[in-house]
Design a protein with these regions (language model features):
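An exposure/low-complexity boundary signal
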Residues: 1-13, 171-184, 233-249, 254-257, ...
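ATP-dependent carboxylate/phosphate-activation module, predominantly the ATP-grasp catalytic core
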Residues: 101-102, 107-155, 167-213
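Active-site nucleotide/adenylate-binding loops and adjacent lid/helix of ATP-dependent enzymes
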Residues: 16-147
Length: 275
């Protein structure tokens, strides 16, 4: 499996458009306000406030106002006042806990107008981790389209948003960091769009992204690789020491499967016997 960054290096287009939030913040100075999650929540009238202002209702989600590293760094679900007063982090805020389904969208924008999008249904686990991300055909809700197009006037490029219960909880001026549904043809399409303003609509085959998260980085995880090799599953190992990893859980690896039920079975086997 090849990352978008690796594809762009291979195509000699590494500086054509950013693939991480740090580079996106620097490149798109006119639009990097989108990374301010507190302002984004306020804009949508989602109950929120900076710490140490105390919420009237629990549970809430606490996280950094701006996080350019990703991987849900600093994400915490706070269930009551007693837990809340223990948090002493600067630069954090809280927002209403949303318990609906989460959908992530990769979006193609031309001159402030959305011309294409790709949806992933994300099923959460603990502390900002996920069971899986499954590609599905689902349009962006009209109110979210209007919000994005009002905010991103004249912007041309890519955007990734995370939606729960009709609210944008996070937005990024880049494509999904794991880039698992797109092949080389689609990479060429993205390059042609940015270089020449030409975009071709393409079909995406169904597939699911299965992450494997760990707590103990000193454990020997050879049995995990043995299970994946037994099933002849293609996987990509993450750098568990990267500063972009989460505070509690680290993503050891991920694998992709076009058979959703088989992927769930393999993931269950890994978590049941190895972790």
């Amino acid at each position: 499996m090849i990352s978008l960054n690796e594809w762009l290096i291979k195509k000699k287009c590494i500086n054509l458009f950013p693939t991480n939030d740090i580079a996106s913040w620097i490149k798109y100075t006119e639009y990097n306000f989108i990374y301010d999650k507190l302002s984004l929540a306020q804009l949508q009238n989602l109950d929120c406030a900076p710490l140490p202002i105390i919420p009237a209702i629990f549970p809430v989600i606490v996280k950094p106002i701006i996080n350019l590293y990703g991987m849900s760094r600093g994400f915490k679900k706070i269930n009551n006042y007693e837990e809340f007063i223990l948090i002493k982090d600067n630069g954090y805020f809280w927002e209403k806990y949303l318990d609906g389904d989460q959908y992530n969208y990769d979006i193609v924008i031309e001159n402030g107008k959305i011309i294409d999008s790709f949806c992933y249904h994300s099923v959460p686990l603990n502390e900002g981790t996920f069971l899986y991300h499954q590609y599905i055909e689902k349009k962006i809700p009209p109110n979210i389209v209007n919000l994005i197009e009002n905010l991103m006037e004249n912007y041309t490029g890519f955007m990734n948003i995370e939606l729960i219960d009709g609210y944008i909880i996070e937005a990024h001026l880049r494509l999904n960091g794991d880039f698992f549904i797109f092949n080389e043809t689609m990479v060429d399409n993205f390059i042609n769009f940015i270089k020449n303003g030409l975009y071709t609509f393409q079909d995406i085959k169904p597939m699911t992204f299965f992450p494997i998260f760990i707590k103990n980085i000193s454990t020997d995880y050879t049995p995990v690789f043995n299970i994946l090799n037994k099933w002849n599953i293609n996987y990509k190992i993450d750098n568990i020491y990267s500063e972009t990893q989460g505070d509690i859980y680290k993503r050891l690896l991920y694998f992709i499967c076009t058979d959703h039920k088989l992927g769930l079975s393999i993931q269950k086997e890994i978590y049941l016997y190895c972790l």
